[in-house]
């Protein structure tokens, strides 16, 4: 292996060219991801299902494609959301939705609770579109998963996107890398060696 690398180590210019080529591949992938994020209006336009809470609709390891340009989330729609203070996307179905032009369907009790809530950055307003979610394979709704003191999700603040398509099982690679950090180092090492060995 070192014998194969010897020509590159003895030729700094060629080695630098290979490193730049590797950096170009990474930057192209990054720009593609950012472009997709802008188009879908989602910070994470592609996510992986991490649990079995949405079976049988989605299995662990399925790769989901998201769209976040709709102002509302309808009952029955599958959304991905982030819990405040956590960085783990959750894929669940909307079972209740109200607010932001729902025709005044809120209960008086809910309106009173909203009137008592403070307003400010990161907090839902009484006019925001709010939803309640639940995993298809779960018995209870997601209230216990939300941030402390949060009864519902805010469509604008908490939702990453709505599911518009998926590819089964492809995301298992991501799960394996997340559960085994050493595999990331090995994978990057292999990619680096492959680029170094690539001849123009």
Swiss-Prot record:
Residues 34-200 are lumenal. The chain crosses the membrane at residues 15-33. Residues 101-129 are annotated as: Disordered. PANTHER family: SIGNAL PEPTIDASE COMPLEX CATALYTIC SUBUNIT SEC11. Catalytic component of the signal peptidase complex (SPC) which catalyzes the cleavage of N-terminal signal sequences from nascent proteins as they are translocated into the lumen of the endoplasmic reticulum. Specifically cleaves N-terminal signal peptides that contain a hydrophobic alpha-helix (h-region) shorter than 18-20 amino acids. It is found in: Endoplasmic reticulum membrane. The gene is SEC11. Residues 186-197 are annotated as: C-terminal short (CTS) helix. This is Signal peptidase complex catalytic subunit SEC11. InterPro entries: LexA/Signal_pep-like_sf (IPR036286), Pept_S26A_signal_pept_1_Ser-AS (IPR019756), Peptidase_S26 (IPR019533), Peptidase_S26B (IPR001733). Keywords: Endoplasmic reticulum, Glycoprotein, Hydrolase, Membrane, Protease, Signal-anchor, Transmembrane, Transmembrane helix. Its EC number is 3.4.21.89. PROSITE patterns: SPASE_I_1 (PS00501). GO terms for cellular component: signal peptidase complex. The lineage of its organism: Eukaryota, Fungi, Dikarya, Ascomycota, Pezizomycotina.
